[in-house]
Structure formats: C-alpha cells, structure tokens
Amino acid sequence: MIVGKAGKGGKKKPSVWAGVPRWAQVCTVFGAVLMFVSGVALVGVEALVARYEGAVGKADLFGDQAAGASERTSDIKGPLNILLVGVDPRKEEQLPLADSIMVLHVPEGLDQAYLFSMPRDLYVEIPAFDKAGFRGGADKLNAAMSYGSRVAGENPSTAQGFELLAKTVQSITGIQRFDAGAIINFGGFINIVDAMGGVTMDIEREVRSEHRHPDGTHRELRPGGGGYVGEQAVYPEGEQLLEGWQALDYVRQRYPKNGVPDGDYGRQRHQQQFVKAMASQALSADVVTNPIKLDSVLRAAGESLVFNGRGHSVIDFGLALKDLRPGNIQMIKLPGGGIMDGGQYRGERFEPAVQDFFQALQDEQLDAFLLEHPDFQNKI
C-alpha cells in the first residue's frame, strides 16, 4: 500500500530532504549501501558491482596520497573507524558545510557496529591547517570543513575540507586514524529510494504530517504565524509501503498532536526504524535478483558517494562487512546541551560522561560501557 501518493501537477514539489535530520540521511545512505554491496557481490553480479564501483567518486580525503604515503594493501581487519560526512549540493565557488558528521565504529569481529553522531554545532577547538592558511581557533564543528576547503585562487576543495574535519574529530574522540571516509551528497539520494520502489515500514500508530499535503506538496504557513494550514498527509497504523518523500516526512514528525506522544524520542525511534527498513530493503530478493532494479539502485548510490578507503574500495569494505546486518548496528546518542554566553547561543557541548564513552571506544570496551550507561543507547 502506498499512502498519500504524490500527484504530478500543480505546485512544484520541494526537496524531499528539507528538514530531515541529517544523521538519518547519512546512516541511510552509507549503511544501506555497504550492506547492499556485500549482498550483491555475494550473489555474483560482478558486472553490476564493477559498474557501481566505477560510479563512486574517489578523492584524497585524508591528505596522505599527495605526500606519497603508502596506502593500506592488506586485508581489511577490525577494529575500524569510518568517518561519514553529509553535505548538500552547493555551487562550486561556495564553501562546503558539514551538515552531518557521523562515526561508524566496527569492532575486531566485523559483525557488529556502533554508530554515533557528532553535533554539527559542537563548540570545539579546530586545529591549525597550513594547506588552507587556517591558524586554528574555536568554532562550531561543522565549520572545520569550510575552513579546511579554502584553496588560494581556486574554488574550494570539499576533499581538503574533509581532511581538516577528520583531524578535528580525531582530536575530540581520541581516534588515532580513520580507516575510511565518505562524503555523501544528499541531493541525489532520492533516486535510490525511487529505484528501490519505496520502503516498507511498520508504523506503530497513525501519524499526521505537520509539513505535507497528501500529494507531497508543502502545507502553507498560517498567516501571522501559529503553524500550518491545509489537509495533512496521513500515515496509517500498520505495515505501509512508503514512497521516498513519504518515508522521509514520516521520520520528521515529533508533535503529540500529530500522533507522536513521546515527542522527539519518538521521532528518533522512527528514524532508526527507517534506517533499518532501508538496509533490509537493500538486501531483499526483490532488489538483489532484479537486474534492472539492481542496476538503477547501484548507479544512484554510486553517484551519491565520494569514498576513500586508504587503498581499499567501497566494494572491499562491503565484502569485509558482509556479516554486518541491521540488527547488529547499535545506535548511540551522546548527551549534551547548549552553551549560552550573555544570553547568546554559542553552540553545543558534551556532558562529562561522553569522554568516558570515547575512552571506552579506544579501549574496545563499548559493550561494558553501555551496560553501565544504558541511556547512551537509542532503543528501537
């Protein structure tokens, strides 16, 4: 059942990513792609896998290729730390911003993982970066990509900006080295959802959209403020096949008046349900055994990614993580709060216990840490 199917005429349909929480976008794209690639490779569709690998963008995200550093050529072994950064499409002359910053930590066995977000507004010390002429200083974390991307006399380099962002995240978390990194362009990801034919989700209770009409167009703001007016898209209780814009709209909802009694906690739960539904759909026989659909999904996914695996391709990582499945990925929430200075918002900061989390990550003791700190787990 496709609920609230969008029409073709009338108002121009806004971007489906408008207002969607960035962590959900990143996790959906890269997590589903990795598991999808491993499943495809295992069933032996070599030609399509090669086509996908050719579509994935490649760049020197860590700044060591130009220096002649030897790339990693041994088999992929855990533990692994992968930095995932989501960006929106921008003009070539505009400085890039890291709209979402996430770390995927995979223990030695390569069959489970922990995924956590770094708040883009986290107020941090950004280290000096000679390549971009940046002397270092305190700012919000997402600004590191902009500072690092500056190239004298040329358009900004997103890959070079990623390098400074990676150094900044390492200084915060204590991670010595990232084993891989990816830049995910949200602009093209809707094609993946369309190519898959929608996503099946089990909706726990009826939810009404704050933002969309049943045809997918935006509801209008009430004159003078006070919310939106017009008919709402409705997501009925039970198993539903949702189009891309519908699934993304559903995971935005957080108001009790619209059927989400636990507010933002409920929204986070719905987001994680969506992530796992996407990953499961990517591995379904309907996708993997359908050459036409498979080709469309692979090409759309490839066009949304720029990847650097320090000598290993995204296919190599997909195969190395072949035992990693949606149920084995633990979603982590890092508690924090806002910093106010003279009544002005400066950014976010972590609670002290987050440093203990980072130490447990370095010591490979996250399971023990989470037993003692269950509030760090995003339950689904």
Question: Where are each of the predicted segments found?
Answer:
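Non-catalytic, solvent-exposed segments at the cell envelope interface
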Residues: 2-380
